[in-house]
């Protein structure tokens, strides 16, 4: 069977994702759709609106055949590491094609990536008032004429770089984003496709009726179930503030992505008087030209999870394929992939795995449970992959 890969967050799953799945199959002629999906935390360092099992269920109900978790050590990273992790997993599964949405679908991202090795030493990197990502984009534009600034284009460039770095045989296919831009914050009543961020914003404002036209039935069911959502703002900040108050500067400095004195700035703002009263006000107080919002949020998540640099480096050297769910077709493909993949396939997590290979995912799952006020809703231990059939859904035994 021929498989096409999708790199996803599904936060939440919406009609644009259905279009993506349909186009992926049409463009490649694939028999099986495999989604590599972020777990309980997404790339920007925020908790997903719904847990990974709820989002897996929605994906399987709407055309995906196999869902593999993108481990936290890849999922909560800058775009180039996020993309490399996803391509590494899809390559290990024997996926031939990856289809992605792009703001500029006619661009040859693989050719663009081939020109990139000469970029990093350019003049743009001497500018002190830019982030690394901004400097990189500026230098790339000066050498290639293409301005890399839209989120999906940045990820596409990351996929292309990863394919070159990993010597992967995967072929890339871009499809043009339709109806909604990545950062759109609103949508009209007659739209059938809206951005995930605009859907989250509408839900935050309590506008359930408004989102009915832009999400499938399964997502509506999930939205209606308060048991699956995260109360992020009110729950995250007290935990983080306590951590910043009690850790020493030396301890904070060991956290992954804590660099250039960021630990001093975080502690000073958190301990100031009267001090920020919310997570968002804290982020805004910390923000500077040197750090993007996403960079700060990722670092704060790793602070709360107490992830050290050496722990992250070790985890990234030991990837695995965590199976979250499959259809009958996905299960058949998986049975074949087991014979050829070089990465461990994990379908059930026990205490040993939770303390070893999956330690970071396990901790992230526990934190998500805490934020969602669902202490009994296990995210990893003893959870089985979802086996989706049209007749019924079950956790595979």
Swiss-Prot record:
Q: What keywords are assigned to this protein?
A: ATP-binding, Cytoplasm, Ligase, Nucleotide-binding, RNA-binding, tRNA processing, tRNA-binding
**Cellular location(s):** Cytoplasm
Q: Which InterPro entries match?
A: Rossmann-like_a/b/a_fold, tRNA(Met)_cyd_acetate_ligase
Any one Pfam family match given in the protein's UniProt record, by short name: HIGH_NTase1
Please provide one cellular component term from the Gene Ontology annotations of this protein: cytoplasm
This protein's record includes keyword RNA-binding: yes
> EC number(s)?
6.3.4.-
Q: Does the keyword Flavoprotein apply?
A: no
Q: Name one GO molecular function term.
A: tRNA binding
- Please list the reactions this protein catalyses: cytidine(34) in elongator tRNA(Met) + acetate + ATP = N(4)-acetylcytidine(34) in elongator tRNA(Met) + AMP + diphosphate
Q: Which GO terms describe its biological process?
A: tRNA modification
For the ligand (ATP), the binding residues are 7-20, 101, 152, 177
Entry's family note: Belongs to the TmcAL family.
Q: What does this protein do?
A: Catalyzes the formation of N(4)-acetylcytidine (ac(4)C) at the wobble position of elongator tRNA(Met), using acetate and ATP as substrates. First activates an acetate ion to form acetyladenylate (Ac-AMP) and then transfers the acetyl group to tRNA to form ac(4)C34.
Full protein name: tRNA(Met) cytidine acetate ligase
Species source reads Leuconostoc citreum (strain KM20)
């Amino acid at each position: 069977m021929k498989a096409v890969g999708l790199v996803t967050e599904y936060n939440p799953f919406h009609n644009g994702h259905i279009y993506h799945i349909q186009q992926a199959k049409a463009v490649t002629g694939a028999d099986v759709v495999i989604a590599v999906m972020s777990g309980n935390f997404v790339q920007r360092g925020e908790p997903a609106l719904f847990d990974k099992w709820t989002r897996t269920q929605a994906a399987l109900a709407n055309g995906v055949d196999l869902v593999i978790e993108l481990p936290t050590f890849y999922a909560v990273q800058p775009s180039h590491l996020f993309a490399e992790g996803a391509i590494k997993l899809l390559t290990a599964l024997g996926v031939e094609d990856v289809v992605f949405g792009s703001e500029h679908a006619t661009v040859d991202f693989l050719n663009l990536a081939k020109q990139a090795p000469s970029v990093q030493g350019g003049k743009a990197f001497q500018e002190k008032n830019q982030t690394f990502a901004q400097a990189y984009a500026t230098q790339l534009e000066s050498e290639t004429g293409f301005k890399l600034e839209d989120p999906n284009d940045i990820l596409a460039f990351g996929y292309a770089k990863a394919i070159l770095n990993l010597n992967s045989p995967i072929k890339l296919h871009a499809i043009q984003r339709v109806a909604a831009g990545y950062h759109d914050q609103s949508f009209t009543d007659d739209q059938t496709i809206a951005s995930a961020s605009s859907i989250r914003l509408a839900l935050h404002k309590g506008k359930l009726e408004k989102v009915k036209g832009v999400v499938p039935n399964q997502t509506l069911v999930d939205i209606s179930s308060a048991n699956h959502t995260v109360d992020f703002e009110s729950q995250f900040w007290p935990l983080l503030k306590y951590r910043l108050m009690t850790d020493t500067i030396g301890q904070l400095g060991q956290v992954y992505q804590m660099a250039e004195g960021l630990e001093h700035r975080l502690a000073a703002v958190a301990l100031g008087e009267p001090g920020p009263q919310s997570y968002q006000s804290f982020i805004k107080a910390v923000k500077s030209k040197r750090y993007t919002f996403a960079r700060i949020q990722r670092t704060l998540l790793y602070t709360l999870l107490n992830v050290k640099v050496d722990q992250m480096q070790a985890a990234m050297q030991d990837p695995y394929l965590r199976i979250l769910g499959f259809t009958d077709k996905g299960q058949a493909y998986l049975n074949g992939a087991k014979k050829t993949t070089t990465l461990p396939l994990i379908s059930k997590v026990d205490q040993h795995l939770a303390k070893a290979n999956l330690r970071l995912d396990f901790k992230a799952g526990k934190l998500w449970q805490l934020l969602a006020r669902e202490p009994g809703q296990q995210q990893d231990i003893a959870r089985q992959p979802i086996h989706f059939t049209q007749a019924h859904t079950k956790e595979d035994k």
